[in-house]
Design a protein with these regions (language model features):
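A short alpha/beta connector and helix-capping loop motif
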Residues: 44-82
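Rossmann-like AdoMet/SAM-dependent catalytic core
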Residues: 20-25, 70-200
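S-adenosyl-L-methionine
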Residues: 1-43
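Generic detector of contiguous secondary-structure segments
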Residues: 36, 41-52, 102-105
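Conserved hydrophobic/aromatic beta-strand scaffold that supports enzyme active sites
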Residues: 33, 58-60, 114-116
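Hydrophobic/aromatic beta-strand patches that form the interior of the parallel beta-sheet core
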Residues: 3-7, 59-60, 108
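Short, conserved beta-strand edge motifs with alternating hydrophobic and charged residues
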Residues: 35-37, 60-62, 110
Length: 200
């Protein structure tokens, strides 16, 4: 159906995807659209692709709704523990913004689990865009849907609501999120592997 589409189901590291796989498939540096949805190291892939000089006009990246702005979170690549689809996988909207904004991108929407960015020079085509991540997070996820990270005794939606109510106290918000992640690791049957995972 899409003769130029390339599907590669291997699990390369972000460096491989940024510097080898994309090059091997002759993806143009100024591609029109980039979609990242790997259920794990999404922001590591984004960093590698942008650092390699690729400049898509639009980017759609899956971002975990479990970590609301302004918290910054991402699972870091570790070749010894390539846990794709981990409950700790993913990247927060605020972390993605830190990565992509220096490359000249504007956030135009956050639709529950996907952040949509366009090059700054195209932002005017989308009308009056208010690119504040907190506002767009609330518009795109008004019920505070949170499918991962908060497991066991932690209800996803209520945990996100608790974090959102702590926005006025960043230290308390961060401490509560860290405590929640520790509880998720402790309650998980994958706790040995998760203890070895690195996240920011």
């Amino acid at each position: 159906k899409w003769p130029k589409a390339i599907v590669d189901l291997r699990s390369p590291s972000p460096v491989e995807i940024g510097f080898a796989l994309v090059v091997r498939h002759a993806v143009p540096k100024n591609l029109d659209f980039l979609k990242i949805d790997v259920d794990s190291y999404d922001c590591e892939y984004l960093k590698a692709i942008l650092a390699a000089g690729y400049s898509p006009k639009a980017v759609d990246i899956e971002l975990t709704p479990s970590i609301p702005p302004p918290l910054k979170y991402m699972l870091k690549w570790n070749p010894e523990y390539p846990v794709f689809g981990s409950i700790l996988g993913g990247c927060s909207l605020s972390m993605a913004m830190d990565i992509i904004q220096p490359y000249g991108y504007t956030l135009i929407q956050y639709a529950m689990e996907d952040g949509w960015f366009v090059k700054d020079e195209y932002a005017h085509l989308f009308g009056s865009v208010h690119p504040d991540p907190t506002d767009l997070y609330e518009l795109g996820n008004p019920d505070h849907y949170a499918p991962n990270i908060w497991t066991g005794n932690l209800n996803g939606s209520s945990m996100v609501e608790e974090l959102v109510h702590l926005r006025g106290n960043p230290a308390a918000m961060l401490a509560r999120a860290q405590d929640g992640i520790r509880k998720t690791i402790a309650e998980s049957h994958l706790s040995d592997d998760l203890q070895r995972m690195e996240y920011i």
